[in-house]
Amino acid sequence: MKTTSLTLTFFALSLCLAFTPAQVSPPSPAGPGTAEAHPTDPTTLYLPIVTRTATPSPPPPAWWQPSPGTSWQWQLSTPIDFSFDVDVYDIEMFDNDASVVAALHAQGRIAICYLSAGSWEDWRPDADQFPAEVLGKDYEGWPGEKWLDIRRIDLLAPIMRARLEQCKAKGFDAVEPDNIDAYTNDTGFPLTYQDQLAYNTWLANEAHARGLSIGLKNDADQAQDLLPYFDWALTEDCYVQDWCEQMGVFITADKPVFAAEYSDEISAAQFQSEACPQMAAWEFDAIFKNRDLDEYRLGCP
């Protein structure tokens, strides 16, 4: 399309008007000792002064999120032995009140709340709240304990939520749900991989909703799938049973693996001379315990 000379002339005039500085009235004379606000030249272009504010720090996480290299003690007996110089104590929920958790906090320690999320225990104060239909086969080797039908989240939810509320009310920082690999055991129910995945994910979300960190207990085959939902892992016998490396995905994600080896499977000397170097190579935080989880603890040299 041809452009006429009239159009070009109008366009040039528009540009001139657009870039002509606005006329500014000169300021009043400054008083004695007072600097002028700005020069009086009306053709001077003044740019605003832009200041930057510091980027605010991100908010702290809503729950404890540890990293590898966190030392720990695991004691499910009472009374608690507070003498170990460690970062974390993993202790029983029902048998310890808020004063024990407060004492750990006073020493600058994190308190983990142990509870069973996959089995029924006949000695617990809430044992009568479990409907008969969710109770499965006896848990072999643990008298008074039965597996739970984890498919029935509708029936288990009120009980498990109440337990998590107890953890929170007592001041715990985290929760260790035990027996959350039921689908790999003879429970009396046809539990599947997906059943366990759904239950464990539900548990993690419930813990986080209460500001509680949560650890994946054993359940190595689901470690990759559950990694986004769990903040750390805890293993038993993974060295002697040769499955520790499955939990390495947690280390890769900068989440610790708390590893326990037991005195009924390996000697203390073997633990320190054989298991510890390998645990260090994996960056696991390993301890040597009696299986009844009393106060005895041996760390790596």
Annotated model-derived regions:
Residues 1-60:
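Intrinsically disordered, low-complexity Ser/Thr/Pro-rich tracts
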Residues 58-301:
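Glycan-processing catalytic domains of CAZymes
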